[in-house]
Amino acid sequence: CCSALCSRYHCLPCC
């Protein structure tokens, strides 16, 4: 995951 905010919900390439 690129950012902690994104990783809370889903592992996205980069938000």
Curated annotation (Swiss-Prot):
Which key words tag this protein in UniProt? Acetylcholine receptor inhibiting toxin, Amidation, Disulfide bond, Neurotoxin, Postsynaptic neurotoxin, Secreted, Toxin
GO MF annotations, alphabetized: acetylcholine receptor inhibitor activity; toxin activity
Q: Which domain of life is it from?
A: Eukaryota
Location, primary (coarse class)? secreted
GO CC annotations?
extracellular region; host cell postsynaptic membrane
Post-translational modification, briefly?
Has a free C-terminus.
- Which cysteines does the record link by disulfide bonds? C1-C15, C2-C11, C6-C14
Cell compartment(s), UniProt: Secreted
| Tissue specificity comment | Expressed by the venom duct.
The keyword Kinase appears for this protein: no
Q: What does this protein do?
A: Slowly and reversibly inhibits human nicotinic acetylcholine receptors (nAChR) alpha-7/CHRNA7 (IC(50)=45.7 uM). It is unknown whether it inhibits nAChRs by a competitive or a non-competitive mechanism.
What family does the Swiss-Prot or TrEMBL record give for this protein? Belongs to the conotoxin M superfamily.
Q: What miscellaneous comment appears in this entry?
A: Has low or no effect on human alpha-3-beta-2/CHRNA3-CHRNB2 and alpha-7-beta-2/CHRNA7-CHRNB2 nAChR.
Q: Cite the domain annotation text.
A: The cysteine framework is III (CC-C-C-CC).
Q: What is this protein called?
A: Conotoxin ArchIIIA
